[in-house]
């Protein structure tokens, strides 16, 4: 079994879901948290937001400063409509990079249905067909062929 750690970024790290994700992944033996991103509080330590986190982690930074080439996986814990914009910018430039989206952006394949439910246009409709909405434990084999995983939340 490989001892190599997976390099990850968490975008939306200071929100409610993002903080829980940071807390859980900071304890994972096969994960190296490389970036913790938010739109506010740049430069602050994550422990400012959650005292449960004991591990020394990178300070909060902007997603504009990410070196995508060193990452294996990106978690997105953003408001609906935001993850699709970021994934659209990065997806084709970094072909080995995978994404786990905790918003609703890739849960619904039909752009018209997405708009009727969330009241915003989906700005990356071509990527919807390249994503899977799934609980990974139930679709272990199918999930491997996708780089965008919409996680139920």
Spell out what each predicted region is.
Residues 1-153:
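N-terminal Rossmann-like NAD(P) cofactor-binding subdomain of oxidoreductases
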């Amino acid at each position: 079994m490989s001892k190599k750690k997976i390099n990850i970024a968490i975008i939306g790290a200071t929100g409610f879901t993002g903080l829980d994700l940071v807390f859980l992944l900071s304890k994972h033996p096969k994960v190296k948290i490389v970036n913790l991103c938010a739109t506010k509080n740049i430069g602050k330590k994550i422990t400012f937001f959650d005292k449960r986190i004991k591990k020394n982690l990178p300070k909060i930074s902007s997603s504009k400063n990410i070196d995508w080439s060193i990452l294996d996986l990106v978690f997105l814990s953003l408001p609906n409509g935001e993850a699709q914009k970021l994934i659209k910018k990065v997806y084709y430039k970094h072909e080995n990079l995978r994404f786990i989206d905790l918003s609703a952006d890739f849960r619904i394949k039909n752009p018209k249905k997405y708009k009727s439910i969330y009241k915003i246009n989906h700005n990356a409709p071509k990527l919807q067909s390249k994503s899977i909405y799934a609980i990974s434990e139930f679709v272990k084999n199918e999930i491997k062929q996708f780089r965008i995983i919409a996680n139920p939340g």
